[in-house]
């Protein structure tokens, strides 16, 4: 499996039970993609190789999920995979129409105001504990964090790769002060 087609979403926290189940700590806590997952990849931190495993079953658990892989026969084998990085096919991180989007889907989109003026480019994401934040490189080369909340979002335009937001006046001025 190529890492470019895989997305790091968590790590194997520990073996779970006697039959080779794995407890995967998912960094975001969001596991809507788990039901569609047919394979996953594991990689040791000191390695470049991602080994592919076949999913037998999954179930939500704590801040992640329990996964049973066909290739992991028992607890001893599962313990040998503890602390490995957990990757999924990046196609699982694409929302369907009407679903909540994954933030990674709008990375590198332009941020525009309702008048269609480009305010910057979405270069990353952060959180203030209450809400997701878009990390935006503004047109003057500065960086601003913009709350990604329904009250500000007017449109997410996948065709033109733009997010249109009606932001409070002066938000960028406050960020860049």
Swiss-Prot record:
InterPro entries: PRC_barrel-like_sf, PRC_RimM, RimM, RimM_N, RimM_N_sf, Transl_B-barrel_sf. The keyword Chaperone applies. Pfam families: PRC_RimM, RimM. Keywords: Chaperone, Cytoplasm, Ribosome biogenesis, rRNA processing. It comes from the Bacteria. Residues 98-171 form the PRC barrel domain. GO terms for cellular component: cytoplasm; ribosome. GO terms for biological process: ribosomal small subunit biogenesis; rRNA processing. The keyword rRNA processing applies. It is found in: Cytoplasm. Its main location: cytoplasm. Transmembrane segments: none annotated. GO terms for molecular function: ribosome binding. Belongs to the RimM family. An accessory protein needed during the final step in the assembly of 30S ribosomal subunit, possibly for assembly of the head region. Essential for efficient processing of 16S rRNA. May be needed both before and after RbfA during the maturation of 16S rRNA. It has affinity for free ribosomal 30S subunits but not for 70S ribosomes. Binds ribosomal protein uS19. The PRC barrel domain binds ribosomal protein uS19. This is Ribosome maturation factor RimM. It comes from Bdellovibrio bacteriovorus (strain ATCC 15356 / DSM 50701 / NCIMB 9529 / HD100). The gene is rimM.
């Amino acid at each position: 499996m190529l890492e470019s087609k895989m997305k790091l979403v968590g790590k194997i926290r520990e073996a779970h039970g006697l039959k080779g189940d794995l407890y995967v700590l998912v960094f975001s806590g969001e596991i809507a993609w788990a039901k569609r997952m047919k394979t996953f990849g594991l990689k040791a931190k000191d390695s470049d190789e991602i080994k592919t495993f076949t999913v037998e079953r999954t179930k939500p658990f704590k801040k992640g999920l329990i996964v049973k892989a066909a290739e992991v026969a028992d607890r001893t084998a599962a313990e040998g995979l503890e602390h490995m990085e957990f990757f999924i096919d990046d196609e699982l991180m694409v929302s369907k129409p009407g679903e909540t989007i994954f933030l990674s889907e709008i990375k590198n989109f332009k941020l525009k105001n309702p008048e269609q003026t480009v305010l910057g480019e979405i270069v990353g994401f952060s959180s203030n504990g209450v809400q997701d934040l878009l990390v935006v490189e503004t047109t003057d080369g500065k960086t601003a964090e913009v709350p990604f909340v329904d009250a500000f979002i007017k449109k997410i335009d996948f065709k033109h790769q733009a997010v249109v937001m009606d932001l409070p006046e002066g938000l960028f001025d406050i960020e860049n002060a």
